[in-house]
């Protein structure tokens, strides 16, 4: 994208210099094609005596139309035009650096220059609608009655750029339209008419736009743009480029890109202070460290990719995003925030990825009351929610439900899918609630060793030991959560995996249905070791920081688990305040070996030169526990785990105990030292 921007950015200084040196010196110069004249004031301000009207439209043609800082007046006294058209017929671009004012009755103003229009400190007064365009002007004359005609204005655009310089563009307008092949905004564009029906609209790319000139210049209840068509020209250019110094502020803001493949890139601020922000393109839309804020709705749409990086997108009402792919990510200044006072709706024909950013619907007041609607994500492909190194990935509905539907997988990686209401996840593929884990040496399997050294008298120097390494968790403070406060958690998928994460409903049910396998597992990290060295004396030392993370499913009500092939709880905990029902051919309750260390380096043994230590191995987790009953529709297998219910445990196929939960010392071969025989 940046390569496409270079020609436009580099051309701006040349345009400014070229116009200021020659064409700007000429200012506003009629070409003689219309009855238009110009007079110059002592301050340098120019007055344009506009041509008589046809159907309420005054058409004026120029070889040069540039406005210096002294400004220019369009004299509408005695003409009473509703619309004043100013079109440049030469090859000179236009530069507007001052005020353009309508003398006399208020009028709509159109400036059309196919060679390009640059505004740097320009403003408009006593105007209704203002159109800046690089299109060619034509007219559509409509006979309303004998001798009565309405002349509509048509702008056909296929080239030229509108550039807003650092000085910006301002006015109190019914509406501002920017129509060009390309649009570059390097300064503030402000329409001070605060109304949800007035604003700023950009139509960028090849297009033909028709304006109904019958409307009064004071009528902000009707849109005078009655039609826009586009040939669908293919382009990979960045059609709209807004720099960090640029911005758009109005009652309503619309950016519409017509060319196929052309996109929008914004680092600036877009603010609709009374209505909506709408950005529609046929290429990629990229908002990086910029902001979109609307007092009503924000709508973003493209068949391409929408990427929000460190961006702030907020709406008082709804946020609606539709794209081929949607990607939210954080950067060094901070996370992307996509939030709405009511509902957030993201729809993708591809994938949706949220990395280290916040998607939130609704608000929570200081007194704890909540308002708002749902967070709804729908993707034909995968939905991925992950945390970054610095920021959590969060999807949160403050008052409604959080609902994710994917044609592929739903992956919640070290991130959080939350709701004060209900949570619903539906995937044609797998649902994974996981944390990042780097495996230890030997795959977490224990390793024992013995080393025999030199001898002294009848003593042999022997060292024996034991090590186990479960690896590390990248960020133990960023566990994966799927949680609902006042509603159920419902998950439907091909396979379900909760590895190191937490799934919970505070006061309702958790229901998980997997077409194939259900797996709930704690992730174990840390190392355990034991070393014993004997020669004349024996010295032993033990250590363990083995810790389980997550693997928790809990509900204030009932828990329902359905698996087509197998249900496994590996070192985790499944707990229900109500009942647990597992509908699967076979259900495994599997403990994972944890370790604790005991060291005795003082006392009687140490007095004689020896120290004592021990490693205790125990089964951790693998339990299904309910205050109500636990019901298995198939077989149950205990491998270091457990099934327990306050109202009993039943299994249609019976329960087989392969290994009951145990706690035993790890046995290491002992070797004789001088004092060992006293306490072996």
Predicted regions and their residues:
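Solvent-exposed adhesion/ligand-recognition segments of exported proteins
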Residues: 2-6, 15, 20-273, 280
